């Protein structure tokens, strides 16, 4: 990417035009960030994003009115109720971003994009675009907007809205990495997920009960298939698709005897002992803005409650038929006296959702949504998966918090939902939240990972993931399809991995022999790569970079890579090819993961697939890839035994990252890093920098040397973390 010389200052006439439509205010926030606003009446209202403090607060360096930012000089005007912005585009200028507004394109020029959340076709529209000339723009509005990228005017990106004020940020940078860094400083850095979230999440069949779940967890262990997350779909609820804050368990399937003296004896903790972390599916139709308004007005009291999940908890709504006649009415905990038959048993008869058959719209919403979920956290739930459900519906006659029309709230809703879930869990547990939302808007990367919704795991979801990667969201995934090695290759080499069984029976041991072997091998591969993927996640938090990186991000100066989707980088050093007959190998020396074949790029290589291997995987020469011995589940962000895989043929510098894996300490810098320097045939393991709670004093390290198809492991034994350690490839190996 080349940043041209600063354009000549020529904005006097433009500012004069703008003045006719109201005051223009340009705040410089940093050398690469500006905030532009126009008012109609002398007031700068701000958006609901500002009111609810969703994006980080910014400090103003200086104030002016010029719209010349060197690499771009936009034009702006306010209409009667909305606005029009025009950003000039040069010949050949590429445009990326705009979230999941369309899965038809990756490079966005030419195209017209509707920034409005829609079910299936546009789960996460993001009003952010960046270009190959080194600038980007993000709108600070939640109203519906349109980005016309070189269609109506082939030499411009025209952004318009029927409602809202001119309020946007301009970011500049030498490449897409710098632009995403600036963008996530404006809208918020991506969170790091708890360590287990970078493993594998299994979503059970919706009609499974506690006995089947525990048995399935045992089978994952017995078959040696790594797995951490364990998600229950809506069948866990007493009332199928319960949108209310009164939800409780379907006690026909999930039992809590009142006479137990410890929650450790329940099925949830049996799952926990098998290494599985419980995730609960949620649906919502709650007026989240009521509580946000209380917070904005200083009337809400922050909760000081802390999780009691180490104690015996009997939650209202659980009834044990075995206690009938033996306990008094006060001693027995009974179900609510409802006459409606449990709808989970009638799931197939439930009609397609429409706004008029959803429940919960009239609930008292003065308390935060997360409040009613605390009882489930106390019982052992460690994650929540939020359904698109009512989030994507349009409520034309609804007033949110009694005063805001849906036109202003529709795009905002999933952002507030993720925020309340994230902050609620973090405050209550002092642990990292894992709150998964398929819907989102600008800034949601602070709170939630996303997946491609109810669209499977095919090639179009890959386009979606790349578009989100170029829109500040490093944690994107899709529903794992277990019916081919190609789809397993894609899903297990994503930023995070989940399988949705819904009504199906796709447990690995129910697949064919080849499919089972492929599933297990890919799961083990992912878990062995945990420290490498985790390091990429840390970099995503620190800089806003993707974990799965499109070629356009990594090689911005190579126009031939501008539209590439099926070849991409996983972190700094792994090249993935999927859903294609060939993989593009960039410049340099690379090693085929399976065969060790050395390949000199740039070139194209055919992807050799079979029933157990579904794509390409290459490693860059000069890389040092930290790996773990395969674990069946992950409980912390470090391990005593570590393998450092050094790929000879080029010099390189890599980084080895660790933290405790579960706490929020990483946000205050509680982590350690060590520089891994490969020069010729010598690897230097740098002294560790930083610290975190529980950090080991030393590691048991094995260096595995790779030279073509040859490998040689050298055990270093216990290596102290406080000094440099160098080791060379064995001379007799050459």
What is each model feature region?
Residues 592-612, 711-734:
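Solvent-exposed beta-strand/loop surfaces of large extracellular or lumenal domains
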Residues 10-17:
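Bacterial N-terminal signal peptides
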Residues 1-2, 20-22, 734:
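Basic/polar N-terminal segments that are highly enriched at the extreme N-terminus
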Residues 24-52, 56-58, 68-614:
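Catalytic-domain carbohydrate-binding cleft regions of carbohydrate-active enzymes
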Residues 622-716, 725, 733:
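Accessory, solvent-exposed terminal regions and/or long lumenal/extracellular loops of proteins
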Residues 46, 50-78, 224, 568-570, ...:
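Acidic, contiguous internal or C-terminal segments within carbohydrate-active enzymes
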Residues 1-9:
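Bacterial N-terminal signal peptides that target proteins for export
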